[in-house]
Regions:
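Conserved phosphate-binding elements of NTP-dependent enzyme cores
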Residues: 1-950
Length: 950
């Protein structure tokens, strides 16, 4: 390898890496693979990327570095040949409700510019195209005011702009004006006016003060002309005691008199007060308390806890009980009356209050009783007021459980002011454009009819928008709309959006480190993704991709296999080179699967199920097109389809939420369908997603699975603990007593970074052990409680082998391929796939009924094919016990093992939402309309060939 064209790593020891030496070619597509926990991410992200980032930070000035903090040097002897590094992972999804696909990709900025430069304004009321106004037309409009109306003619020289505005104020003085209105307050220009520099101000010069009469027309025309000259064609008529009138020399509707100022990009921004809808401030939605969530089951009475809202749960002797009794006395119900039997008036008073009417309240306490009269606010107004006013995040979260998002009645979810929405290009406004899919937007831009002049002005903008939309399409995201909220994107989607954005930036000589970009991607779209990564490489960049996808490996220039096992059994370079090189290495598990020496078998027979089924009738949420789907029970079911075809909507939004509401009493609102039939055959539903098992470093696999409670009890039963009088609570790091008080049992201290995510550093007192010295003196088999938390699951399985209660829970973690994680590993450091498997292990450890429905969303995320093999066996075990497992999956090794496939499509977005194929994998593979079938057929054929050789 050319010494000038390589990245050389010497002595990498980060996490479980064992003094790794490695050479990587530059300007190539490199795939790092290996078992989950083998050390791939430690090498790619925590060593190579971290050192590239640290070196960049050190090149900045000390002033800039004070805001960024000190980056720790990775545990590595030396890395040479490193370029500036950019990480594209899945943990940086925006949760800001104002972020959309359009804003994240910056395409929306170009659209705002496009609508500002070549947009055609219309009247928001009549839809008529708006043209320029003359001074005479403005005068005629003002003269329509009633006789004797007093008004001021103002010239708005500054509109909502930061700064002291000294220059504009001096110019007004020199021009001979006497008064000025600043932010609604009048000032004399002869006095000194000091404005706050960092606040936005509006400055309007008072040109004239007039009263409507027969003789004022000439003077009014002169004053308007003066104001227009001062304020670049704008004038404000401030009617005393009435609504102000604004005129523009540019645009106004002749029929309704609505003026539109000169079009600017900020008019089309929903994050700017000039463009945002005034009612919802640009969010497009409101959070409102949902009566159906406050009282989810009207068959129950108040005493039976029919009301499920923060502060309003029924309890004897509480203020809520006193209120309910008073309402019952006034409106004729008791605490034992089912809510469904309440009169309309009674239910309205309970939920929305008694208005001005005071009702008799009977107060009882240990000091006696008394009567007083008071108005009742109502449960819903009370909750909404508390939600607005509270500073407690916990209270907000509690109230949010009974709230739902409702479309803004003013803008109908479109986020912008009526005047902004009345501007069109090619006949559609900016919100309509953003509601189209990326594929439809590309078609629209290519066919939009605009004038020759507008085409010349808009050509460079069209070019930028088309390029960026093309990049989104090339990474398999053609089904997304630009108006879609960034928070609703999956990890894989947000990562591919950032990948498309990087291609748009066209940087060269950069090191990109990617974390499983193929997650959530159908095999059809995976080919596009690989082509995109090659395109980034061909620009002159190096790509290091942590990936398990076989197609990506076969297309890579160079593969690094890290292993051979996970955790302490990993951390070595097992093989490096081409696919052929990897296949030759006998100890490479990746090579064994790539060469066909090992493979995931196709079952000889498919399960028949129990003959019963769940049926979703006429599902029409999002892009689902009134489909009716059967989910046969007692089978392993795979729901497949290209990205955006409606899989998550059908399974998570409709089926899971409906079952959870009916069987578990969940309060989430299910997606729209006519009915879900067959629920009587199921007694429990368990959804296992990739959300974190906890949002702070205090949460860990041991606490989540409940095994830590058993371990604490075990420690409290030791001779040493009994002598000292220590109970299980002594060994908790969440309560005072046994924990280190310096870090309050966290083992780490949180340092708030004002411009960046918080940084965690080990506690100086306990050195990260979480407990005080006395607690750590108690040992079980020569290990302290802190030592146990530092053990991997695999080590703990051996250590606690003789304690069945603990061993059983640990064994399930081992079964799902998590033998390498530590018991006390912070939840914040677990990937989405790892968190999902911790939840799966937690459910496996419970006693099941044989009538449970398990729903998993892409459980193979982050899994090597060997781990997938193990996971499939775990899922088989659940189904063999009589349960039903429904999996949303793209991984063909899982799909080929399914008993039943439901394939949605045929495309994503508006081109999806229908059932393309159902049946066994063999039946779907023969369906010519199914993209899944097309990729499944060769996989089944290869598996049959390998099994026959075996």
């Amino acid at each position: 390898m050319d010494p000038n064209n390589r990245i050389v790593i010497k002595g990498a020891r980060e996490h479980n890496l064992k003094n790794v030496d490695l050479e990587l070619p530059r300007d190539k597509l490199i795939v790092m693979t290996g078992l989950s926990g083998s050390g791939k991410s430690s090498l790619a992200f925590d060593t190579i990327y971290a050192d590239g980032q640290r070196r960049y930070m050190e090149s900045l000035s000390s002033y800039a570095r004070q805001f960024l903090g000190q980056m720790e040097k990775p545990d590595v002897d030396e890395i040479t040949g490193l370029s500036p590094a950019i990480s594209i992972d899945q943990k940086t999804t925006s949760h800001n409700p104002r972020s959309t696909v359009g804003t994240v990709t910056e395409i929306y900025d170009y659209l705002r510019l496009m609508y500002a430069r070549i947009g055609v304004p219309h009247c928001p009321i009549c839809g008529r195209e708006i043209t320029q106004q003359t001074v005479d037309e403005m005068v005629d409009e003002v003269m329509k005011l009633p006789e004797r109306t007093r008004f001021q003619v103002l010239a708005p020289v500054v509109r909502a702009r930061k700064g002291t505005q000294a220059k504009e104020l001096d110019a007004a003085r020199r021009a001979g004006f006497a008064r000025v209105r600043v932010d609604g307050n009048m000032y004399d220009l002869s006095e000194e006016i000091n404005l706050e520099k960092n606040i936005k101000h509006t400055v309007e010069i008072v040109v004239d003060r007039l009263v409507i009469n027969d003789t004022v027309r000439g003077r009014l025309a002169d004053s308007i002309e003066t104001a227009l000259a001062q304020a670049n064609g704008l004038v404000v008529i401030d009617v005393i005691g009435g609504e102000p009138m604004m005129f523009s020399q540019s645009y106004a509707c002749p029929e309704h008199g609505i003026s539109v100022e000169e079009l600017t990009p900020r008019m089309f921004s929903f994050n700017n007060p000039f463009g945002a809808c005034e009612k919802c401030t640009g969010l497009g939605t409101f959070m409102k308390v949902d009566p159906a969530r406050v009282i989810p089951d009207k068959r129950k009475s108040i005493r039976e806890s029919a009301i499920k809202a923060s502060g309003w749960y029924y309890a004897e002797g509480s203020i809520s009980e006193m209120t309910y009794k008073a309402l019952g006395k006034r409106y004729g119900f008791t605490l034992d009356t089912p809510v469904k039997d309440f009169s309309k008036e009674a239910l309205h008073a309970l939920l929305y209050g008694t208005g001005d009417e005071r009702i008799e309240m009977q107060r009882e306490s240990m000091f006696g009783s008394g009567t007083y009269f008071n108005q009742f606010e109502g449960i819903i107004p009370n909750l909404e007021r508390r939600f607005r006013e509270t500073s407690s995040e916990w209270v907000k979260e509690e109230i949010a459980l009974v709230m739902s998002s409702e479309e803004c009645p003013a803008c109908h979810g479109r986020r912008l002011k009526p005047t902004s929405l009345a501007v069109t290009v090619g006949g559609i406004n900016i919100a309509d454009f953003c509601d189209k899919s990326v594929n439809e937007e590309l078609d629209f831009i290519n066919t939009a009819k605009v004038s020759t002049r507008d085409e010349m002005i808009g050509a460079p903008i069209f070019k930028e928008v088309k390029e960026r939309l093309g990049f989104l399409k090339s990474v398999g995201l053609g089904y997304l709309t630009l108006s879609r909220g960034a928070a609703s994107l999956s990890g894989g989607e947000s990562q591919r959006i950032r990948l498309a954005t990087q291609i748009g930036s066209a940087l060269t000589g950069v090191l990109y480190v990617l974390d499983e970009p193929s997650i959530g991607l159908h095999q059809r779209d995976n080919d596009k993704l690989i082509a995109t990564m090659k395109r980034l490489r061909d620009l002159g960049n190096t790509l290091i991709v942590v990936e398990h996808d076989e197609d990506t490996m076969r297309q890579a220039d160079y593969i690094v296999d890290v292993g051979p096992g996970a955790g302490v059994h990993g951390g070595e370079i097992v093989a490096a080179g081409s696919v052929a090189d990897i296949c030759k290495v006998k100890r490479s598990i990746t090579g064994a699967y790539l060469s066909g020496r090992k493979f995931v078998e196709v079952p000889e027979t498919r399960r028949e199920g129990n003959g019963k089924a769940l049926r979703v009738v006429k599902a029409h949420e999002n892009n689902l097109q009134d489909i009716t789907v059967d989910f046969p029970l007692g089978k392993l079911i795979c729901v497949t389809g290209v990205s955006g075809s409606g899989k998550s909507t059908l399974v998570n939004e409709i089926l899971y939420k409906t079952l959870a509401a009916a069987l578990n009493g969940a309060r989430s609102r299910p997606g729209q369908c006519e009915a879900v039939e067959g629920m009587e055959w199921v007694d429990k539903v368990i959804g296992i997603d990739q959300s974190p098992i906890g949002r702070t470093p205090r949460s860990n696999p041991a606490t989540y699975t409940g095994v830590f409670g058993d371990i604490r009890t075990l420690f409290s039963n030791t001779q040493d603990a009994k002598m000292r009088g220590y109970g299980p609570g002594r060994f908790s790091f969440n309560v005072k007593g046994g924990r280190c008080e310096a870090c309050e049992g966290g083992g780490i201290l949180t340092i708030e970074m004002h411009f960046l995510p918080d940084i965690y550093v080990p506690c100086d007192v306990c050195k990260g052990k979480r407990y005080n010295r006395e607690t750590l003196e108690v040992k079980y088999k020569d290990k302290t409680i802190s030592d146990v938390l530092d053990m991997t699951v695999e080590e703990a399985c051996v250590f606690f082998a003789n304690i069945p209660k603990i061993a059983r829970k640990l064994q399930t973690l081992q079964e799902v391929g998590l033998g390498y994680i530590q018991l006390g590993q912070a939840a914040t450091t677990l990937s989405g796939g790892e968190a999902q498997r911790v939840k799966l292990a937690n459910e496996l450890a419970r006693r099941d009924t044989g009538q449970t429905v398990y729903i998993l969303d892409e459980p193979t995320t982050g899994l090597h094919v060997a781990d997938v093999h193990r996971l499939v066996k775990v899922l088989d075990k659940l189904v063999d016990a009589g349960n039903t497992v429904i999996v949303i999956e793209h991984n063909l090794d899982v799909i080929k093992r399914a008993d039943y496939i439901i394939d949605l499509g045929p495309e994503g977005g508006s081109g999806g939402g229908t059932i393309v194929a159902t049946g066994t994998p063999e039946e779907v593979a023969q369906n010519p309309h199914s993209f899944t079938g097309q990729y499944l057929r060769p996989v089944l054929e290869r598996a049959a060939e390998l099994q026959s050789q075996k």
